């Protein structure tokens, strides 16, 4: 059963439903739009560096959420980017303090693109070789952020404002933290947060 949510002032309606596996789905269709936007968001962000599973406390380095976002694009046969490129869709992702979102914009092949979005996010494929390769890519991204005036200013401000809070940390993690992320960290986080229930 879908719940109907009226968006006041926009004359639009969103439908909300919950799948049997616990996944919450929002649907919005508008005759004004020709393209389709799809987003799958996981309630796991850069603040989630400590968590408890079965009464056992786990700690992962800052930057693990962003690292996992990157590495999820790898598949057993190629990358998610390759699939979406073939269908003419654009795919991207981003990590915030509180969640990670995988997004697809498509004009055609909506069902195939939606199925692949669900598949690549919900199917884990990690190995040590991938972890090491991705570290190099993310370290370069972190270096660029350390040289970007906007990023430096933003997190400098947050560092002053939130001296004793995780909000002071870069979402990407710093270089030392990125280097310390392990295959075990990635697998543990995925198995804890990237499940529907």
Listing of model-derived features with the role each one plays in the protein:
Residues 1-80, 187-197:
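His/Glu-rich zincin catalytic helix
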Residues 18, 75, 79-197:
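Charge-rich, well-structured scaffold segments of protease-associated domains
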């Amino acid at each position: 059963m879908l719940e109907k949510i009226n968006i006041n002032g926009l004359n639009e309606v969103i439908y909300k439903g919950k799948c049997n596996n616990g996944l919450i789905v929002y649907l919005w269709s508008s005759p004004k739009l020709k393209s389709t936007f799809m987003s799958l968001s996981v309630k796991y962000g850069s603040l989630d560096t400590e968590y408890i599973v079965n009464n056992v406390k786990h700690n992962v380095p800052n930057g693990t959420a962003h690292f996992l976002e990157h590495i999820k694009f790898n598949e057993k046969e190629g990358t998610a980017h390759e699939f979406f490129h073939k269908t003419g869709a654009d795919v991207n992702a981003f990590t915030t303090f509180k969640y990670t979102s995988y997004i697809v914009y498509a004009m055609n092949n909506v069902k195939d693109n939606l199925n692949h979005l669900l598949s690549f996010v919900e199917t884990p494929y990690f190995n040590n070789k991938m972890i090491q390769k991705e570290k190099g890519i993310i370290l370069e991204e972190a270096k660029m952020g350390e040289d970007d005036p906007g990023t430096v200013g933003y997190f400098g401000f947050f560092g002053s404002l939130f001296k004793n809070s995780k909000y002071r940390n870069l979402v990407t993690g710093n270089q030392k933290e990125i280097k310390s992320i392990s295959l075990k960290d990635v697998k543990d986080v995925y198995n804890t947060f990237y499940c529907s229930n």
